[in-house]
Design a protein with these regions (language model features):
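Membrane-embedded alpha-helical bundles that constitute the cytochrome b-like, heme-associated redox core
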Residues: 1-178
Length: 178
């Protein structure tokens, strides 16, 4: 049977970091999947502040990780620790790289590579889903279910967006061949 655990501060911070991160993924996905959303100011405003929201997501994730390490006193010399927490650690490392390069100087220096580097955010999205399922399923709080719902929704939006973009590309190529 599913046991619902009490809500702890690290869990609250984890879910808050997750939803803040999801907000950074929304603008592009909304604009492609729901073209009528362009008329509203929501995607535009989210796009305008996306870097700052992403940095906030990183800082909240940092607090989440810090509190968990202190609370559970992990043995970092044990390989099982890395195996169990690999998805969370990998997504955290991706967030570190994205946060460090979320400035105009990095955009100018990295040029096309900056955009490629920031495509890692989609890997983090899948890793976070794995992290939530792997570490929380079976003993999570009600916040865990909100997190699972949120990350699943953004993954579905992303997959739909990729499908729409692939279809548009296919039509474009067919027009060029004709």
């Amino acid at each position: 049977m599913l046991d619902i655990a009490p809500v702890t501060l690290p869990n609250v911070l984890g879910v808050l970091a997750l939803f803040t991160y999801i907000v950074t993924l929304l603008p592009t996905n909304l604009r492609v999947v729901f073209p009528s959303s362009r008329r509203t100011k929501i995607p535009t405003q989210l796009l305008k502040y996306r870097r700052w929201i992403g940095i906030l997501a990183f800082l909240i994730a940092l607090a989440h990780a810090y509190l968990l390490v202190i609370k559970r006193s992990y043995d970092f010399l044990d390989l099982k620790t890395y195996f169990i927490y690999f998805p969370g650690l990998a997504s955290f490392l991706i967030l570190i790289v994205l946060t460090i390069t979320s400035n105009q100087w990095s955009v100018k220096k990295l040029k096309k590579n900056w955009k490629r580097l920031h495509q890692l955010t989609y890997w983090a999205m899948f890793l976070l889903c794995w992290h939530i399922f792997g570490t929380m399923l079976g003993h999570g709080s009600y916040l865990t279910f909100l997190g699972i719902f949120g990350i699943t929704l953004i993954i579905l939006l992303y997959l739909r967006r990729r499908w729409i973009e692939a279809e548009k590309q296919k039509v474009k190529e067919q027009k060029l061949q004709a």
